[in-house]
Each structure stands twice: as structure tokens, then as C-alpha cells.
């Protein structure tokens, strides 16, 4: 069994009288440690499937198996716990608190995570050891993205 398995996943949105099928019986698997790319034209359902994998949306049918557990059947409380404890999700447009340093931004996020890692250590791991006391405006876009990852 793969680490991530999406099996026959369907997601539909209702826009007035129009039904939009964002994901139509999608199937794929990703092994643990494997790098995967989700590629497609605008409106192909890439963000939808990522939102479902990240626990921010749910599918209408199918299975979303992460490490042997089908999260497609999770209720709202279980999805919240999953988002907090089991998945990391970095958006294309991320938000850092502008008047907090990189380290303080990571410390803020670590307050809501069980067994959070040491903020200084994770900033070192993403190559920001010398920049942890800088404010977001003093960091490049890539450095800001790494703060978000940390």
C-alpha cells in the first residue's frame, strides 16, 4: 500500500443550477518520500485535490488514504486534528505576521501544534539560521516561503 492513495475521488460544486465536476474519479498513489507533481491546466482540479489531501475540503465520494487511514470519512473535528497534527500545507500566497521576526512567526505557529519542533532548529534546517531575527520585509520571497515551511 502506498503512503498516499487517492481512489476514485469525486468532488462536485453546485453553482446555482450548474454542477461543476472539479475531480472526476481521480486515482493516484504516492510512496513515502517520493516527490510528486500535480500538473494540469487552469480549472483542472489541482487545488481541489490538494485541499482535500490537506484536510481543508472533503470529497463527495471515493477514498483518500493517508498512511493507511481513510480521511474521506473524517468528521469536522477529526479533520481539524488532522490539519493540526498530521499535515503541513504551504500556500502559494502565504501570510507572515509583518511585525514579528522569522523566529517569532515560527514560535507563534508552534503554539497550536502538539509536539512542535524547536523554532530555532527548524529555521536552521531550512537555511535561515542567520536570518531568524529578521522581519518578513527584510527577507526575500524565497526566505519568507522557508519561514512558512518551518
Where are these predicted regions, by residue range?
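ABC family nucleotide-binding domain
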Residues: 2-150
Amino acid at each position: 500500500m502506498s503512503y498516499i492513495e487517492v481512489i476514485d475521488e469525486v468532488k462536485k460544486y453546485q453553482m446555482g443550477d450548474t454542477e461543476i465536476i472539479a475531480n472526476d474519479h481521480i486515482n493516484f498513489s504516492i510512496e513515502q518520500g517520493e516527490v510528486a507533481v500535480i500538473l494540469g491546466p487552469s480549472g483542472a482540479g489541482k487545488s481541489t485535490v490538494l485541499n482535500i489531501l490537506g484536510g481543508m475540503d472533503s470529497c463527495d465520494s471515493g477514498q483518500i488514504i493517508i498512511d493507511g487511514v481513510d480521511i474521506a470519512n473524517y468528521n469536522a473535528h477529526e479533520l481539524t486534528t488532522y490539519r493540526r497534527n498530521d499535515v503541513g500545507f504551504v500556500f502559494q500566497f502565504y501570510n507572515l505576521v509583518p511585525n514579528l521576526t522569522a523566529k517569532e512567526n515560527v514560535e507563534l505557529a508552534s503554539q497550536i501544534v502538539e509536539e512542535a519542533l524547536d523554532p530555532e532548529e527548524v529555521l536552521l534546517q531550512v537555511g535561515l539560521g542567520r536570518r531568524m531575527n529578521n522581519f518578513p520585509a527584510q527577507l526575500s520571497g524565497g526566505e519568507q516561503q522557508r519561514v512558512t515551511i518551518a
